[in-house]
Amino acid sequence: MPEYNWPDPEHRTLIGRRTLRVDAPVKVSGQAKYTYDVKGPGLLFGKILACPYAHCKIVSIDTSAAEKMAGVKAVEILQKPGAQIHWAGDEVVALAAVDEGTADDAARAIKVKYEKLPHLVSDAEPPPGAAASQGPLSLDDVSDMLDNQVPEREMVSQIQQYGITAKPSEQDLKELKEDGAGAPVLDALQAAAVHPEAAGRPKSRYQKAAVVTMGEVDKAFAEAEVVSEGLYGAPVIVHCCLESHGTTSEWTDDDHLFVHVSTQGVSGIAGQMAEPLKLPASNIHVHQDHVGGGFGSKFSPDRWGIASARLSKKAGGKPVRIMLERARELEVAGCRPSAYARVKVAAKKDGTLVAWDSQSWGTGGPGGGGMPPIPYVFSIPNQRKQHTAISNNIGPARAWRAPNHPQAAVLTMCALDDLAAKLNMDPMEFFLKNLDLVSKQRQTTYAEEFPIAAEMMGWKDKWRPRGTNLSGNLARGVGLSIHTWGGRGHASDCDLSIYPDGSVEIRMGTQDIGTGTRTCIAVVAADALGLPADAIKLYVGDNQYPPSGGSGGSTTPGGVSSSTRRAVVDARDALFTKVAPALNAQAEDLEAVGGMVRLKSDPNRSLSWKEACAKIGAMPITAHGHNDQIASKNKPDLTNSGVGGVQMAEVEVDTDTGIVKVRKMVGVQDCGLVIDPRLAESSVMGGMIMGISYALYEEKVMDPTTGRMLNPNMEFYRLAGFNDIPELKVHMMTGKGYDERGVVGLGEPPVISPGAAISNAVANAIGVRVSFLPLTPDKVLSAWDSRQKAGA
């Protein structure tokens, strides 16, 4: 059986070493092509007419004036009269014109009448009164969930849990399918319990989404020696991809579509476009070269992607490009749900956690918002949790890097930090004290990571009790947080070819969204063949290549590296079989090292790589590698799941202005076998920088009167800039106990803890908790003033 296992450290030539990214030359030279750069002959410019209201019904649409304008080649009504709009900026009409000016003029010429409906865009206040229990779903509710882009898995869960008010007819199912309902949703509807008595019952915007009780909560609190109560929260924020969402579509003939799209899932887009376009998925060719980030928001072709294809069809097959302007990107391309909670948590005097009680709420837009996984990381023995999902009109929710985990970290780690302060304990000692409450898989990891992080931060010298490190108007403090994630590799297929001239090609239907996926694949292949990484010719970003999963859930590194490893080992072994007679050796006695194929026991008996490949014959060696999403007992598992990390932050707070400056952040992280330390460290640093943004600046600010976003631009929707980025130090956990686990994903974990760590550092600095992120000057000053008035 081929030796698919990852090589031991002494037999690795590239794996675990710092490698120049293989896409670096095209990026720094400006040659990298993104969706916006696709400019084929006859390119038409797509434009979306968006609804200005947060909640309304479309009464009428008149596109006649736009259709008559010179230069307008196609108009497509996306939502017909009678349709309900659930957020400002939702798409109503799309058009294509010969230039952007004409497209803008045509959009202004379209007349749409709306019936305004009541809207809600707030979510930070606790739900008024008792939340209603979720009732059975009507077919309109299901249709609304499709319009609101509620994830399929969540739709199925709600249908199964709550049932429906009426059994769907064949026509109902057909219409839902045309609206985008997948087979799991349709199957769930047909199997669901029917509750006709619930039909017509008015639905509350505040739905009791979860009530969980474990252990003897009241008894545990009554017997606890120390109890802390607090209010914590993180608002709705958006993805802010450097490259906005967009698609260029072109019909190559009447039945074949070519789509260039900015997506995190190139192999899955055709299947999503097939039903709306009434076209076999095999007739849709999806391609991309480079993607400027997605962070969970770019898995769907979206309404504008479907529109670009339909406009192209109406325009005689000419390419139509629709790219979201920055304002629309911030308004409608997805948001991270909010999460707020009143938390009461208790411990013994020695710091042993005994009880947790929380009333949480939040929104992900019209689809409501699920309960974040609280208490996070720690399985506190006695728990009571109630969550209220708020359905409002703030915009559509989408997965945001580590869905729900950053919010859970804020709610949990800040509550625990407050409890540690009440116990007069160093929070690191408090966390270490309770490591027996985390999963056994992670206990050793955290125990090893904490002292490393503390040494990097200088925690012992910098931590002081709350509010005691003051120098004039400057307060300094440190804070910490821990996090966990899965990250097992997704299903992935890889085709690898070795040619008689020595060239090596890999084809894989994955995508590189800026994370270094190309480099990861090249390093794994080159390591096994004894070649430099740039010797591998990589072809990715196309659904005509072997399928590979979407880049989400930190599943890509494990998936692509495992399928590549299997393919390259098979191809290398086939090459050894061809070469062995020339070296008077057995194939199993050969190795590929340093551009040579040689005898393991006698390196002088060798052929250069090109000489060895010349023995192949006329036809290339081809091999196929596959990684299973679920571990198989029949072959070695090259990927795994479950990581843990510790982050610490040091801040300086100006108590006159309320401005928070992060002075230093450290991150200690495991991810199994590290393919390239530079890529891994970059991912951790990127997560920490992203965390600084949502900790200090980011919030989707809404006008409660109009229901519109007030900061849909990069001037007022602020991200961390160069002057905001502090000293960043990263340590990757590698070696014995880590490498043998195989490759585990790293995209999500580093972004989970920064918000909580920075919030805890600010509380340590000024001696009082700022309840909600972002930690803006007004909130900091308000908290500081309350402390001063209390005589602290």
List each model region and its residues.
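Short conserved micro-motifs at the rims of enzyme active sites and ligand-binding pockets
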Residues: 491-494, 674-678, 740-744
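General marker for long, soluble alpha-helical cores
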Residues: 132-198
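Short, conserved non-catalytic motifs in the polymerase core
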Residues: 550-552, 556, 738-747
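Metal/cofactor-centered catalytic core regions of large enzymes
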Residues: 28, 634, 640-644, 667-721
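Structural alpha/beta core scaffold segments of enzyme domains
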Residues: 1-133, 197-668, 725-727, 731, ...
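C-terminal substrate/ligand-recognition segments
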Residues: 653, 693-699, 746-771
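Glycine-rich active-site loop/lid that clamps phosphate-bearing ligands
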Residues: 608, 699-744
